[in-house]
C-alpha cells in the first residue's frame, strides 16, 4: 500500500496511506486545509505574543536590577556557599589547616634546637647526666 508523507507546521512528518487521502472528498480536503492554515496562523501569532512577553519580562527585570549577570552571580554565590558548608570541604579545610600547623610547629622546633639557648640547655643537661652517671658520657 503506497504512503504519502505530509509536513506539519512544526516540522514533523505524518504518514498517511494514499487510500486514506483518496477517501476524503474534495470539500473535506479543502476544509482540512483551511483548518490547518488557521492553526498555523494561530501558532505564528502565539509565537509573536510569546516573544513580546519575553521582551517585556526582560525590561521589567532590567528595571528591577535583575540582569542575567546578577542572577548568575547569585547562583554562583549560593553554590560556593553550599560547597563551603559541605562536610567534604570542611574536612578538607580542617586537614589542610592541621597540616600547615604541623609544618609550622616543626619549623619552630627546628629553630629552637638551633638556638644558643637550647644549645646551652643541652650542654647543661649533658653535664648533669655525666655527673649523675659517674662521669661516663653516653654520647661523644
UniProtKB/Swiss-Prot annotation:
Oligomeric and partner information: Interacts with TPD52L2.
Biased composition (Polar residues): 7-18
Coiled-coil parts of chain: 28-57
Family recorded in the similarity comment: Belongs to the TPD52 family.
Entries under Pfam families matching the protein: TPD52
Region (Disordered), start-end ranges: 1-28
Top-level taxon in the UniProt lineage: Eukaryota
Keywords attached to this entry: Coiled coil
Species in which this protein is naturally found: Homo sapiens (Human)
Tissue specificity remark: Specifically expressed in testis. Expressed at 5.6-fold higher levels in adult testis than in fetal testis.
InterPro entries for this protein: TPD52 (IPR007327)
GO CC field: cytoplasm
Name recorded for this polypeptide: Tumor protein D55
Amino acid at each position: 500500500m503506497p504512503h504519502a508523507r505530509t509536513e506539519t507546521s512544526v516540522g514533523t512528518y505524518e504518514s498517511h496511506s494514499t487510500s486514506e487521502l483518496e477517501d476524503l472528498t474534495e470539500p473535506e480536503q479543502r476544509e482540512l486545509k483551511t483548518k490547518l492554515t488557521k492553526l498555523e496562523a494561530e501558532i505564528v501569532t502565539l509565537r509573536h505574543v510569546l516573544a513580546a512577553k519575553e521582551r517585556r519580562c526582560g525590561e521589567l527585570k532590567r528595571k528591577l536590577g535583575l540582569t542575567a549577570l546578577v542572577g548568575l552571580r547569585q547562583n554562583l554565590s549560593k553554590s560556593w556557599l553550599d560547597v563551603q558548608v559541605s562536610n567534604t570541604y570542611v574536612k578538607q579545610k580542617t586537614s589542610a589547616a592541621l597540616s600547615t600547623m604541623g609544618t609550622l610547629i616543626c619549623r619552630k622546633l627546628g629553630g629552637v634546637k638551633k638556638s644558643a639557648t637550647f644549645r646551652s640547655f643541652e650542654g647543661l643537661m649533658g653535664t648533669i647526666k655525666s655527673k649523675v652517671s659517674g662521669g661516663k658520657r653516653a654520647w661523644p
